[in-house]
Amino acid sequence: MTATLSNFLWSIFWGGVVVALGAAALTAISRIDRIR
């Protein structure tokens, strides 16, 4: 595996992590707003 390919895969991995965290945060916020 070349360094470029490795960096590309890591960028995709962290991109997915960020998106997942963002979605989880939005879901939590929407649930909190509904409780109120």
Swiss-Prot record:
Keywords in alphabetical order, please.
Answer: Cell inner membrane, Cell membrane, Membrane, Photosynthesis, Photosystem II, Transmembrane, Transmembrane helix
User: Disulfide connectivity?
Assistant: none
Read off the InterPro entries from this record.
PSII_PsbX, PSII_PsbX_type_1_subfam
Give yes or no: UniProt keyword Methyltransferase.
no
Quick check: keyword Transcription in the entry?
Answer: no
Q: Name one GO cellular component term.
A: photosystem II
Task: Write out the transmembrane intervals.
Answer: 9-29
Which GO biological process entries does UniProt record here? photosynthesis
Compartment(s) where it occurs, according to its Swiss-Prot or TrEMBL record: Cell inner membrane
Principal subcellular localisation of the protein: membrane
Could you say which residues form the signal peptide?
none
Q: How does it sit in the membrane?
A: Single-pass membrane protein
Record function comment? Involved in the binding and/or turnover of quinones at the Q(B) site of photosystem II (PSII). PSII is a light-driven water plastoquinone oxidoreductase, using light energy to abstract electrons from H(2)O, generating a proton gradient subsequently used for ATP formation.
Q: How does it assemble?
A: PSII is composed of 1 copy each of membrane proteins PsbA, PsbB, PsbC, PsbD, PsbE, PsbF, PsbH, PsbI, PsbJ, PsbK, PsbL, PsbM, PsbT, PsbX, Psb30/Ycf12, peripheral proteins PsbO, CyanoQ (PsbQ), PsbU, PsbV and a large number of cofactors. It forms dimeric complexes.
Name the family: Belongs to the PsbX family. Type 1 subfamily.
Task: Supply the name of the protein.
Answer: Photosystem II reaction center protein X
What organism is the protein native to?
Answer: Gloeobacter violaceus (strain ATCC 29082 / PCC 7421)
Q: Taxonomic lineage of this organism?
A: Bacteria, Bacillati, Cyanobacteriota, Cyanophyceae, Gloeobacterales
This protein's gene is called psbX
